[in-house]
From Swiss-Prot:
One of its GO terms (molecular function) is heme binding. The lineage of its organism: Eukaryota, Fungi, Dikarya, Ascomycota, Saccharomycotina. GO terms for cellular component: mitochondrial intermembrane space. This is Cytochrome c. The gene is CYC1. Keywords: Electron transport, Heme, Iron, Metal-binding, Methylation, Mitochondrion, Respiratory chain, Transport. GO terms for biological process: mitochondrial electron transport, cytochrome c to oxygen; mitochondrial electron transport, ubiquinol to cytochrome c. Heme c binds at residues 21, 24-25, 87. It holds the Pfam family Cytochrom_C.
Length: 110
């Protein structure tokens, strides 16, 4: 079981997002979907529910409501958390990296 989420460095999280996530995701309201869905408003949203993006059945049926902890659990190993996800990213194994990234995402994805 992944470690509990603890707020981290927003600045380091922004760098992680830029180097690990930005090639597939956008965060701004009304931003386009890329390989992955736009993440604006992801927190408090149910998995697989952004209109205009084609999710796998696995993501839709996982029925998770995203919060900091569920996002941390997912980002540690996406294919283990949701077998059948099409997210190619292998995950962030370091707890600190996940905490930093999620701290950034909580602000950037509002």
């Amino acid at each position: 079981m992944p470690a509990p989420y603890k707020p981290g460095s927003e600045k380091k999280g922004a760098t992680l997002f830029k180097t690990r996530c930005l090639q597939c995701h956008t965060t701004e309201k009304g931003g386009p979907h890329k390989v992955g869905p736009n993440l604006h408003g992801v927190f408090s949203r149910q998995s697989g529910q952004v209109s205009g993006y084609s999710y796998t059945d696995a993501m839709i049926n996982r029925n998770v409501t995203w919060d900091a902890q569920s996002m941390s659990d997912y980002l540690e190993n996406p294919k283990k958390y949701i077998p059948g996800t099409k997210m190619a990213f292998g995950g962030l194994k370091k707890e600190k990296d996940r905490n930093d990234l999620i701290t950034y995402m909580l602000k950037a994805c509002k």
